[in-house]
Amino acid sequence: MNEIERQILAEVSLDAPWALVEDYARMPRWRPEDVNGGVDHLVAALGRHGVPVQVLEPEIYLSIPLHAAVMVGNQSYRAKPPSMSISVPNGIEAELLYLRTNPKTIRSYTRDPSEIFLDGGAELAGRVKGRIVIMEGFANPGTCSLLEEWGAVGVIAVNPGVDIHWGTCTTIWGSPDLDDLPRKPKIAVVAVNNPDGKQLIAAAAEGKKGRVVTEMQEGWFKQKLPVVDIRGKADPDRFVFVHGHLDSWDVGVGDNATGDATMLEMARVLWKNRDKLKRSVRIAWWPGHSTGRYAGSTWYADAYALDFDANCVAQIDCDSPGCRWATSYHQTTTMSETEAHVMRAIKDITGIDGKPKRPNQAGDYSFNNIGISSYFMLSSTMPEGLRAEKGYYAVSGCGGNIAWHTENDTIEIADKEILMTDIKIYLLSTLRNANDDVLPYDWRATAQEFGRTIEAYQKAAGAAFDLAPAKAALGSLSAALDKLYAGIASGKVKQKAANEALMRLARVLVPINFTREPRFRHDPAYTCPPLPTLATASELATMPARLVGFAKTQLMRGQNRFCAAMREAEGIVAQAMA
């Protein structure tokens, strides 16, 4: 840690961030007007510290849950509809069908029925048509879209505990465009708690009918979106982008008032020390994360896409830091090229060795299709031993606290000491990303990840498909990357050329590893495997014979895309070394 880093970290205080946490703990931020009020409160806090802020006002598409219930006979059960369920205030009635789900995938966004269900795969479709399906877990978009495709008229997700969790059931990322609209959910979806769910499962076993009622407020809403731009001195056009969602379910303290507070303190400290920044730092707080499936960050990615393409060196997602008992960093989200940078920051602040985790198709990772090196989504979390001791099931925020997405995500979920630690981790990693002479990325690590992925796919495919061209293209890029980093170390490759290459490589290598859709579009909100254009190779061995020819055709085209990407990346390296 250098002197500037030590000095800036020493200025971190909990005064401003904890005040915001306490205020937001009394301010629900899920209805559109309440989110705008939360933004006004944040803008006032920034103003008190002299931090200038621009407030944008996009119109984004939201679906706000108002009411839900499940009825069987004369018995009524409390329920919550996820965002983007259809609204059926008069209810929809059908026979109940229970499908056992795999407890290991209850928080997965997969659409693979063999991974989701315990009693079969695609052959279950015939049983689903015209039924209201009851399943354990959450109303995940992949599962709900699959059941809709199979003809279900409704879904009841039986949450694992005594509380009901809010969520969303759409696979559409952000506000829909015309191409997305066919995937807009067309069935009623609700969640119930576990005790009630067991009664509903018993009713399904008796062949009973159920009625699902949902009431939603849906449409286009003008939402405030605050952005702080702290200009660097040496290379002000290039920027590190830090962001997180301001809207939450209910008061949402651990998810995500603590994240909003973290970014407030980062803005305060970095603005005060702006003369020490080489590159710029931009910070944004999102509306539409919860009720718009990341609609705020998606709008911003669309509206400023060309600026991101030309100038963004990293995106850093700040979600659920500073929660009680979250003292472990064993599930830290990071792409391979930023892994060493992230792990070093965690080690320098905490003395703990973190463990990296591939980014999910979740959070506000709305920038993958542009191609931005990315890290963090969730940072600190509860140690696995403590989670097991408490009997907690897996959730996707609040540091592992099962208050996530419930009314119980209140002030007790935040922890001052852990919040201070997480603020410093976010601040140090951002500061280094802005100030390192050469961007702290190792694309050789990404190439090694690609190599492991291709080997796994080739092993699964066996003799059915040859990935040798992909291996060769990757090998050529890997050799070029070795020369690039040797040139950077020796000074043969100048810093400006090196940084341009390290940034431009993300525009090629991030999309090929995380997206199926073209650049400047958005992939669906369900699981995307590594190197998705080659991923069909892993399915060949179990694929019905009638589909193998089609799969090989897809793989041929996918391998072409991969090899072309490797060639393009190699060209970026060659230009830097010219």
Report residues per predicted region.
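Noncatalytic luminal/extracellular "stalk/propeptide" segments of secretory-pathway proteins
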Residues: 2-15, 19-127
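Second-shell loop/turn segments in exported
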Residues: 5-11, 25-34, 83, 130-138, ...
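Metal-dependent peptidase/peptidase-like ectodomains
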Residues: 12, 189, 197, 235, ...
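Extracellular/luminal Protease-associated
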Residues: 83-182, 186, 353
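Soluble metallo-hydrolase cores and metallopeptidase-like ectodomains found primarily
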Residues: 87-117, 175-254, 264-275, 280
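Acidic/histidine-rich catalytic neighborhood of metal-dependent amide-processing enzymes
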Residues: 142, 222-225, 248-337, 441-444
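His/Asp/Glu-rich mid-to-C-terminal helical/loop segments that flank catalytic regions of hydrolases
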Residues: 282, 384-449, 539-578
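Mature extracytoplasmic or organellar-lumen-exposed domains after removal of signal/transit peptides
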Residues: 443, 450-578
